[in-house]
A protein has these predicted regions:
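Cytosolic regulatory protein-protein interaction regions
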Residues: 3-152, 157-180
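Intrinsically disordered, low-complexity regulatory regions with latent secondary structure
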Residues: 175-224
Length: 224
């Protein structure tokens, strides 16, 4: 069973949570703070290596609880909370809901990749349904919308999940348009990483999931 954090780890987790929430409260480009907290927890679970069936079941259950937590997030409430910031009153709420929902759904997909044991506990069509939702939310935030720049990470997850060449091309073009608006270096890295993931998928090397594949020491790849 995944170990409970020691005292120092608990304090560190609290400090990280507080920092994340402060950042989210002061920037409309942030995804919902709770999504970031869920991703942090999922990343930690992805490093757990079960030693027997009991520990594998416990890991799957822990991942499932994270998945449910992500799916239960009230994105509308989060989107409306920006009205407490006078400088951000003009941010469109409808597209903010879609951007926040894209992060929530992308977080759920990340959990299924980072903790593959969870997949046995959800319906077989869960990933495809989440992928469809993610593309819907992304398509609802057009280039000219101020929330467009906030969809880079869920856009990357959409590309990583996509096996359909048309969807892959759609994500590539979206990220290329994003980088022309805001030439952030990590977007170039995201595009390069997607090429790697798609290439590995064509070779049949991502059965365990793209997160776990990229975490393989032989890949010499850093996953944050």
């Amino acid at each position: 069973m995944p170990n409970a954090p020691a005292g120092g780890s608990a304090v560190q987790s609290f400090e990280i949570s507080s920092m994340v929430r402060r950042a989210a409260a002061n920037s409309y480009l942030c995804c919902p703070a709770e999504v970031l907290e869920i991703l942090l927890a999922a990343g930690r679970l992805s490093n757990v290596k079960p030693t027997d069936d009991e520990s594998a079941d416990a890991l799957a259950e822990a991942g499932l609880q994270l998945l449910r937590r992500a799916q239960d997030l009230d994105i509308t409430e989060w989107a409306l909370s920006i009205r407490t910031q006078p400088s951000l009153h003009d941010v469109p709420i409808d597209s903010r809901i879609h951007a926040g929902s894209a992060h929530r759904v992308a977080g759920a997909l990340y959990i299924l990749q980072a903790v593959p044991y969870v997949r046995a506990l959800v319906p077989p069509d869960t990933r495809m349904a989440l992928e469809d939702q993610l593309f819907h939310h992304l398509a609802s935030v057009p280039d000219q919308d101020p929330n467009f720049k906030a969809t880079t990470w869920p856009g990357f997850i959409a590309g990583a999940e996509a096996s359909d060449p048309e969807r892959q091309a759609w994500v590539r073009h979206r990220l290329q348009r994003t980088v022309r608006l805001v030439p952030w270096g990590f977007i170039y890295t995201a595009l390069d990483t997607l090429d790697i993931i798609w290439g590995l998928r064509r070779e049949g090397k991502t059965q365990e999931g793209w997160v776990q594949t990229l975490k393989d020491p032989d890949m010499n790849f850093l996953i944050v």
